[in-house]
Structures are given as C-alpha cells and as structure tokens.
C-alpha cells in the first residue's frame, strides 16, 4: 500500500458508493462503511473529516468518472466523418457497453445523493451540476454540428442534449425498479433510433 494510504481511501469510497446506491445516504452508517471496507475509524478520519465529507468526496469522484466516460465516448467517435452519424455512434458507444455499465452498479449515485436534502444543501448538487453541464455541452456540440451539416433546424438543442442524459438516469431507475439490467441497452437503443430519425441518418 502506498505510504499516503490512497488504496485505503479508495477502498472506503468503493464501499460507501455501493452502500449509498443500494440503501441511501441516511440509511448508511459510518459503521456500515467501515465493516464493508474492512478498515477502522482511525483510518477513516485520516482521510475524511466526517460522513458528510465522505459524501462530498464520493460525489466528486463519481462526477469525475462520469465526465471521463463522456470524454472517452467523444474521443472514440471522433473519427466518424459524418456529424449526424457521429451522434448515432456516440449513443451506440454506450449501448454496446450497457451490460458492462449495469454489471458495475445497480443504479446511479446522482439519484441517491439528490434525494437526500442534507446532501443537496451541502453542495453535492453543485458537483452533480458540473457533470450535467459537461454532458449538455458535449452532446449539444455534436447535435449542433450534425444539424448544421445536414441543413436541419433543431428546435432546442440543449433540451435534446439533456434528454440524452436523462435517458441514462431513467434507464437506471427502470433497471432498479424491475430488477432487470436489460432496460439500459433497450432504452439506449430506442434513443439511438430516435436521434437517427431526427437527423435523417441510418440508425445502424
């Protein structure tokens, strides 16, 4: 283990993320986190000043990973020459990885955090807005380029970009409520076909 204890910190965050997603922040006690992480209170307070501090760090890490996933999808589709086809390929990038996404987690941390008034008031909502803004800009830029290249008029690009983000969140809820991870792939497939139709490009 590194001398700075970074592996121990990540183990605590990993345990807390799973517990908060599964049970909610209020129902996840510090003792629950310590048991799941296999660590002590001393180790916990070496890295976090409080349970609320842990929640902020957890959200910050999740947001960073979320934006990294966005950037990875943009990079992976950067060589698609047709802007409209790139929009479709962008969604397909996640659709093809839907099973992997759902095997890693059963729901989204954003939902668990935003339903807790204490966390929202403590600034975690601002962290989440950072991710939402990044997704909106990234997707809106793709849509604008596609509309310009195709001579199309999209009524509200920002709202359409938000719809892409909302589809992910809604799919998480649908998977969680039904107990079936298959809904993530299905919903992304529907989104891909709708965007393809709007942009006048093949959905495949």
What would you call each of these model-derived segments?
Residues 11, 15-61:
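Helix-turn-helix
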Residues 1-7, 201-204:
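N-terminal intrinsically disordered/low-complexity leader segments
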Residues 57, 71-106, 157-164:
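Hydrophobic alpha-helical connector segments
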Residues 48, 112-120:
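Short helix-capping/turn signature of helix-turn-helix
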Residues 97, 141, 145, 165-182, ...:
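Amphipathic C-terminal alpha-helical segment
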Residues 67-71, 85-89, 103-105, 121-147, ...:
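Amphipathic alpha-helical packing segments from all-alpha helical-bundle domains
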Residues 106-112, 138, 155-174, 190-194:
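Hydrophobic alpha-helical segments that form the core
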């Amino acid at each position: 283990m590194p001398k700075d204890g970074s592996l121990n910190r990540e183990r605590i965050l990993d345990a807390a993320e799973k517990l908060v997603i599964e049970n909610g922040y209020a129902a996840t006690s510090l003792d629950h986190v310590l048991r799941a992480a296999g660590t002590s209170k001393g180790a916990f307070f070496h890295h976090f000043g409080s349970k609320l501090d842990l929640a902020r760090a957890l959200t910050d890490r999740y947001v960073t990973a979320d934006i990294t996933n966005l950037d990875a999808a943009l990079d992976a589709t950067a060589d698609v020459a047709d802007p409209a086809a790139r929009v479709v390929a962008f969604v397909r990038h996640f659709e093809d990885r839907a099973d992997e996404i759902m095997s890693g987690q059963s729901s989204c941390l954003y939902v668990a955090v935003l339903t807790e008034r204490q966390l929202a008031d403590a600034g975690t909502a601002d962290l989440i807005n950072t991710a939402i803004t990044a997704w909106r800009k990234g997707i809106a830029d793709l849509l604008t380029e596609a509309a310009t290249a195709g001579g199309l008029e999209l009524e509200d690009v920002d709202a359409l970009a938000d719809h892409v983000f909302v589809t992910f969140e809604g799919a998480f809820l649908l998977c969680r409520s039904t107990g079936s991870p298959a809904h993530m792939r299905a919903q992304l497939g529907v989104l891909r076909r709708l965007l393809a139709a709007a942009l006048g490009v093949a959905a495949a």
